[in-house]
Swiss-Prot record:
GO biological process terms on file: DNA-templated transcription
Record GO cellular component, one term: nucleus
Keywords carried by this UniProt record: Cytoplasm, Nucleus, Repressor, Transcription, Transcription regulation
Residue ranges with Polar residues bias: 24-34, 372-382
The name this protein goes by in its record: Protein SCAI homolog
Low complexity compositional bias, start-end: 1-23, 35-50, 258-274, 353-364, 383-397, 514-532
Keyword Transcription regulation: yes
Molecular function (Gene Ontology), one example: transcription corepressor activity
Main location group: nucleus
Source organism of this protein record: Dictyostelium discoideum (Social amoeba)
């Protein structure tokens, strides 16, 4: 489908170069309907096969428009009931896209008649509402397909609504419902801009949203005023936590670094020292600059197909059911658009040229001053980066570069789900996996430990019946069945896998009424997850089965009333029914499985028995040093390292306010460190086959490399000299790799550049013994 629009020359235009044909985005298993951006001018669209325009009566136009509007609204509402998994939702989305395309073209063609107050009186805010729903359609299609092209399309519509001021006169019309729709539009637009790293637009939108919220509460004094204040507070907290890098420089603004695209925002200010402060944002989508490629002749293979991101932690920074950690993992699981990647490539080459000139000048001055003294410790090792760029150019010439479009893995974002919802999405993701494809589960949740007496009550029956045999409750015969619980009670693996777990969203407060540690406020939180309609049938079947079982047990109990029967379901352990245990994941390990856990109970996944399939788990520290807890306002530290190792390194050592020149230098040093780790991984002969399998995938390789970088940083940092502060993996990585001198020296180069040697141990300095599992 192709739609041609005429663009006016007024200030309402989306872009000055918008006089072109809008080509629909083609994607596999995607809707083909593509709608052009809103246009302020009255546009008449005619088919190329029509020789003359067809005259239509105004009454017929109004009747057709109302019919299309009602039908589109009905279809739009119906999309909420579609499950997020499977493929049955695709034809419904395609039908909705096509109808909204028809509706938008129709109102463009007959805009003058529809806006005539004597005929219909279509308001500009109503046009904006239609455009807002089209943008929302694209956004939800992005969530279901992980294709960032649809996210860009959503941004185009949302931006056009703002530039053409479709909601400008909402406050004058004094229609509270339309004002609420305007506020929701701003909230959705902010989410889209956050996902696209358009922070400059975000700051502008926040100012406008704050003004509109104040107007809304002042005029109508609504009951939901506090809810909108909470929305603003969440946005402010989210942006403050996501402000990864702040530069202080007197002469120059930050340049593009190899970590991603640096974008200046409007939050520039001058401090008391006269330094110019630039708050910047980095794009952390994957590209060949922040993820080293496999060595020749190996090539990257798309192994990761399904990803489930779970955020279920208390007091986590979030906005619109997306926590900061989920947001960062989402960014890390998407490829950077090719145009931006090429731009970063060119900028990096310019940086390398400038650094080489600087090094030559410094070397000449040092040689003249020190009579030829070796100054290798003060130079930037840019040679590996040059080799990397040369390798990338060869790959592109061979057709392995930009000529092949790589797909993002399909993602499910689950905010505070129940255990049944997690298992449901794991099952459908497992079902969709192809041959030699992998599934990733990232879960950030609080951990818990059952008390020893609770565990004993759960495992062992009362002492009065431990050594007895009880008659069978299945039939009326006198067959005796011995109770064998000794093996369960003394099984260390059972105690390891079931005495700890991860707390999820508690949906039934009655189950946790005896637990003093449960926060019942969690029950008010809703999860953006749709349960399939088959649940009703399953519930009915379960109810019938329960009734039958109760009758049978009642009959049998009357004949054996003298036998004490222990009711296991009344044990205090049942208060943790809404929890995730390691054994819950075992059935899904029949196919390649990649697990990332960020929790103080992450160690329980360190001994998970698996099938003969590739399996890797990256586990966070069990605790964070007390001196760093108060400074961690940027989300969970382990996830921060997997997302942006450079900013995370700065966060635990020197803070995030550093000169831009220093940040450019440490970015290149960190890139060199990641290159070293990548090279050692592929050269390691003792590497577990599971790691070797996952290393060929770009996303999983980047997580493994950043995990080793995180391990080396914690290993050398003075505050992390305890086993509970160390990251772990299952299967364990070889010690020859984790403690390789080349990796540790590259970390020390970063330490020297940041001048934080007092916080790190030397390479030959004694450290506490860290026990590796």
């Amino acid at each position: 489908m192709e739609i041609t629009t005429k663009s006016s020359t007024t200030t309402d235009d989306l872009n000055n170069n918008n006089n072109k044909t809008v080509t629909p985005i083609k994607s596999e298993n995607s809707a083909t309907g593509h709608t052009s951006p809103p246009n302020n001018s009255t546009t008449t669209t005619t088919s190329s096969t029509s020789a003359q325009p067809i005259t239509v009566l105004p009454t017929e136009i109004i009747k057709t428009f109302e019919h299309l509007l009602r039908k589109s609204q009905r279809l739009f509402i119906g999309l909420r009931d579609l499950p997020q998994f499977g493929r049955q939702w695709q034809p419904f989305f395609q039908k909705t896209f096509e109808l909204y395309t028809k509706l938008w073209k129709f109102q463009q063609q007959y805009r003058s008649i529809l806006e005539d107050k004597s005929k219909y009186g279509l308001k500009r805010c109503e046009i904006g509402e239609i455009a807002s729903k089209i943008g929302q359609l694209y956004y939800h299609y992005y969530l279901r397909t992980s294709d960032t092209n649809y996210l860009n399309e959503s941004y185009i519509f949302y931006e056009a609504i703002r530039l053409r001021s479709y909601f400008k006169d909402v406050s004058l019309d004094k229609t509270p419902d339309m004002m609420v729709k305007q506020l929701r539009y701003y909230a959705r637009f902010i989410v889209v801009c956050l996902l696209l790293n358009k922070k400059k637009v975000v700051f502008d939108l926040i100012e406008e949203l704050l003004k509109h919220v104040n107007d809304y509460t002042k005029i109508y004094k609504p009951s939901d005023a506090q809810e909108w204040s909470l929305v603003l507070q969440e946005i402010f907290s989210f942006l403050q936590a996501d402000q990864c890098a702040t530069f202080s420089d007197t002469n120059q603004s930050p340049s593009l670094t190899n970590s991603g695209n640096i974008i200046n925002n409007n939050s520039n200010s001058n401090n008391n020292n006269g330094e110019h402060t630039n708050n910047t944002v980095q794009s952390h989508r994957l590209n060949h600059l922040n993820c080293p490629s496999p060595p020749f002749p190996l090539e990257s293979t798309q192994i990761l197909q399904q990803a489930i991101l779970v955020g279920s932690q208390q007091n986590q920074i979030k906005f619109s059911e997306i926590t900061l950690d989920m947001f960062r993992m989402t960014q890390s699981l998407e490829y950077e658009p090719m145009s931006e990647a090429k731009e970063n490539d060119m900028k990096l080459k310019q940086q390398l040229t400038a650094l080489q000139q600087q090094q030559q000048q410094q070397a000449a001055e040092a040689k003249e001053k020190n009579n030829g003294t070796d100054q290798q410790n003060t130079t930037i090792p840019s040679q590996p980066l040059q080799q990397h760029l040369h390798h990338q150019q060869q790959q592109q010439q061979n057709g392995n570069g930009s000529g092949i479009k790589k797909r993002n893995p399909h993602k499910y974002l689950l905010y505070r789900p129940t255990i049944s919802q997690i298992l449901l999405f794991l099952s459908y993701s497992f079902k969709e996996l192809g041959d030699n494809k992998a599934m990733l589960l990232y879960i950030c949740a609080d951990g818990f430990t059952n008390e020893d007496n609770h565990v004993n009550q759960h495992i062992q029956p009362p002492p009065s019946i431990q050594q007895e045999t009880v008659p069978s409750l299945i039939d009326d015969s006198n067959t005796n069945i011995p109770i064998t619980t000794t093996a369960t009670a003394t099984n260390p693996l059972y105690n390891k896998l079931f005495t700890k777990g991860l707390t999820l969203n508690m949906q039934k407060p009655s189950q946790a009424i005896n637990s003093p540690t449960v926060n019942n406020n969690n029950n008010n939180t809703t999860t953006n997850v749709t349960v399939p309609t088959t649940t009703t049938t399953a519930t009915n079947v379960t109810a019938q089965t329960t009734t039958t079982t109760t009758t049978t047990n009642s009959t049998s109990t009357s004949t054996t009333s003298n036998i004490p029967i222990y009711k296991y379901n009344e044990a205090p352990f049942n208060t943790k029914v809404e929890s995730l245990y390691p054994m819950d994941l075992l059935p899904f390990c029949r196919k390649p499985f990649f697990l990332i856990v960020n929790s103080q109970s992450s160690d329980i996944f360190n001994e998970l028995p698996t099938f003969n399939q590739p399996f890797v788990s990256l586990l966070s520290p069990q605790s964070i040093p007390k001196k760093l807890v108060s400074n961690l306002k940027c989300g969970n530290l382990f996830t921060f390292f997997l997302h942006d190792p450079i900013s995370a390194f700065c966060d635990i050592s020197c803070g995030n306010k550093i000169p831009s020149k220093t940040f450019n230098n440490i970015s290149l040093l960190a890139q060199n460190s990641l290159e070293i780790i990548s090279k050692l991984l592929f050269e390691c002969v003792d590497l577990h086959p599971s790691f070797s399998f996952f290393l060929l995938d770009d996303f999983l390789r980047s997580f493994i490399i950043r995990f080793i970088f995180c391990h080396a940083t914690f290993y050398l940092h003075k505050e992390f000299q305890d086993n509970i502060y160390q990251v772990k993996s299952n299967p364990p990585l070889p010690k020859s790799l984790l403690y390789n001198q080349s990796i540790l020296k590259s970390i020390h180069q970063l330490v020297s550049e940041l001048d934080v040697s007092d916080q790190f141990l030397g390479l030959n300095e004694n450290r506490l013994v860290i026990h590796e599992n």
